[in-house]
């Protein structure tokens, strides 16, 4: 899985249940912490 500070192409690249993928300017994405677990 991807590093929390590494670029990611999709939510699937982010580790664990508490991260999500945010896209900023251009095609660059970064993983960030989320308040809710995926699937809840």
UniProtKB/Swiss-Prot annotation:
Its main location: secreted. The keyword Secreted applies. Expressed by the venom gland. Disulfide bonds join 1-15, 8-21, 14-31, 23-29. The keyword Acetylation does not apply. It is found in: Secreted. Belongs to the neurotoxin 03 (Tx2) family. 05 subfamily. Is not toxic to mice (30 ug per mouse tested by intracerebroventricular injection). The presence of a 'disulfide through disulfide knot' structurally defines this protein as a knottin. This is Beta/delta-ctenitoxin-Pr1a. It comes from Phoneutria reidyi.
């Amino acid at each position: 899985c991807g590093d929390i500070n590494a670029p990611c192409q999709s939510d699937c690249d982010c580790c664990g249940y508490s991260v999500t993928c945010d896209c900023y300017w251009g095609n660059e994405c970064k993983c960030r912490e989320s308040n809710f677990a995926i699937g809840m």
